[in-house]
Amino acid sequence: MRSRPSFLTDETIIRALAEHWQPVSEIAYLPWGFGAHHWRAGSLFVTLDQLEPRHTAASLESTYASTAELAAAGLAFVCAPVPTRSGRFTVGTGVGALSVTPMLDGRSPAEDEVDKPAILAALDALHRTPPPAGLREWAPQAGPGFADELRARTAVPWTSGPLAEDARTALASRGDAIKRWNDRYLELAALAASRRGSWVPTHGEPHNDNQVVTPDGLRLVDWETLAVAPRERDYADLPGTPGLDPEMTELFALDWRLSELREYADWFSAPHTGNEDDVIALEGLREELGLG
């Protein structure tokens, strides 16, 4: 996120690091990414994940534990979380969960700089690896009532912030399309469920922003989306990959779109100030709705 969280101080994070990982002398907020907050603390990269709607505290802990298992199994491209002194991977703060990974020496490539052979090799290795015990399975992000509930929510004005009405009217204008997307999504999700025996470990969002090119090769970061799922979940940005099932590719394009719409609806129907993150979120909402 571009803006510092108003609900968590640097001092609180420093105390948590000293208690659960290691003492640090300084900390700096990093205005990177979208959806989570990040800090640099010496050799540590610190993340605050706000749990809902993707996770509970227990499911996030389990997901990061599974990530560590994949790294221990020999997947060198997995940037795994650093365990606490107690062996856990997350620490609750009351406003989310803190986790820590090593601060990597490298950079994320632009979209046109992605080393496709390297990311394809990494994904192939991941998909061939037996899933760790207890790794969560992918589940639909939008249920049968999603479109109708959203239509009802957007039928009355939102007064939650300066961009609330822009978001509401954008969503309301695409109600029929959202219903079509939702119906098709549920049809494809049922098809995927009927093939559960072929599901594999998937990263979920292995796009360029979650790739870091280091002197030792490609590393994949941000594993909170790790789940057992159809392999097509990992190929949204690699559509020409041979052997992909077009229906499963369509499923995960819709999965992304509908989950984004749900999160943006929650975002703008809640109090907000119109800061840089809010502006970026509104642009993202309009893009997902096909409004330019």
PLM features: residue spans?
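Protein kinase catalytic-loop region centered on the HRD/HxD motif
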Residues: 193-200
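A cross-family kinase active-site recognition segment
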Residues: 110-173, 199
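Conserved hydrophobic/aromatic beta-strand scaffold that supports enzyme active sites
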Residues: 38-40, 98-100, 201
